[in-house]
């Protein structure tokens, strides 16, 4: 969780693919701000400003104050970034307005810690990740950049369920059952193969 980052932008004329191409030819990255029951507005940004943000971890869980100068500021979350297939540079950004007074749905990445302290992994166990991100409902001010899962002490066969996780205060899973498996530590591939062969022989 962190404070909103200010990001400079300008209004741009027109909408649609033609207007977006014209914006890119002028050396800017086109974008749009929508949501919060207000009309969508078309914007343009310096590509260096965009790249400086998308290269950071947690871009899609970071709050932004999109600053349009005399045209006002908009509290937003980035919802989508289109990248050029050859140059891998940003060519369009979608921002969604949010209100501090209303809960939102957001997908938060899952990261794991203390893998080397897991007896199961030390024995050759394999960490199988079922959910790489979890969608939650929470206040915009309480969005976590990541959900950390501690693997310390976990043996082969251990499973981590959504109900085991500590979410931020006020946050709830969205459209995911509390009993859903987030990750598990499976036996080494060789061991599983030997077990299968033994069962087949028996």
From Swiss-Prot:
Domain of life according to the entry: Bacteria
GO BP of this protein: translation
CDD domains for this protein: Ribosomal_L25_TL5_CTC (cd00495)
MF-aspect GO terms: 5S rRNA binding; structural constituent of ribosome
GO cellular component, one term: cytosolic large ribosomal subunit
Keywords: Ribonucleoprotein, Ribosomal protein, RNA-binding, rRNA-binding
Pfam families: Ribosomal_L25p (PF01386), Ribosomal_TL5_C (PF14693)
Protein family: Belongs to the bacterial ribosomal protein bL25 family. CTC subfamily.
UniProt-listed HAMAP family: Ribosomal_bL25_CTC (MF_01334)
Subunit text: Part of the 50S ribosomal subunit; part of the 5S rRNA/L5/L18/L25 subcomplex. Contacts the 5S rRNA. Binds to the 5S rRNA independently of L5 and L18.
Function: This is one of the proteins that binds to the 5S RNA in the ribosome where it forms part of the central protuberance.
PANTHER family according to UniProt: RIBOSOMAL PROTEIN L25/GLN-TRNA SYNTHETASE, ANTI-CODON-BINDING DOMAIN-CONTAINING PROTEIN, RIBOSOMAL PROTEIN L25_GLN-TRNA SYNTHETASE, ANTI-CODON-BINDING DOMAIN-CONTAINING PROTEIN
Name of this chain's protein: Large ribosomal subunit protein bL25
Source organism of this protein record: Paramagnetospirillum magneticum (strain ATCC 700264 / AMB-1)
Chain's gene name: rplY
């Amino acid at each position: 969780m962190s404070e909103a980052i200010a990001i400079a932008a300008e209004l741009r004329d027109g909408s649609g693919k033609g207007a977006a191409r014209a914006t890119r030819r002028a050396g800017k990255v086109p974008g749009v701000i929508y949501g919060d029951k207000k009309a969508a507005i078309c914007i343009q940004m310096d590509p260096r400003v965009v790249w400086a943000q998308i290269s950071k971890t947690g871009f899609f869980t970071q709050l932004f104050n999109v600053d349009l100068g005399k045209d006002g500021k908009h509290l937003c979350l980035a919802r989508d970034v289109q990248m050029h297939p050859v140059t891998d540079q940003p060519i369009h950004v979608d921002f969604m307005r949010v209100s501090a007074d209303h809960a939102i749905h957001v997908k938060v990445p899952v990261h794991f810690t203390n893998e080397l302290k897991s007896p199961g992994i030390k024995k050759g166990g394999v960490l199988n990740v079922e959910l790489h991100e979890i969608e939650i409902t929470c206040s915009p001010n309480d969005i976590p950049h990541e959900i950390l899962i501690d693997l310390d002490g976990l043996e082969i066969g251990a499973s981590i369920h959504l109900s085991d996780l500590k979410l931020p205060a006020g946050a709830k899973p969205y459209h995911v059952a509390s009993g859903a498996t987030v990750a598990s530590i499976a036996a080494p591939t060789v061991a599983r193969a030997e077990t299968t062969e033994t069962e087949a022989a028996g």
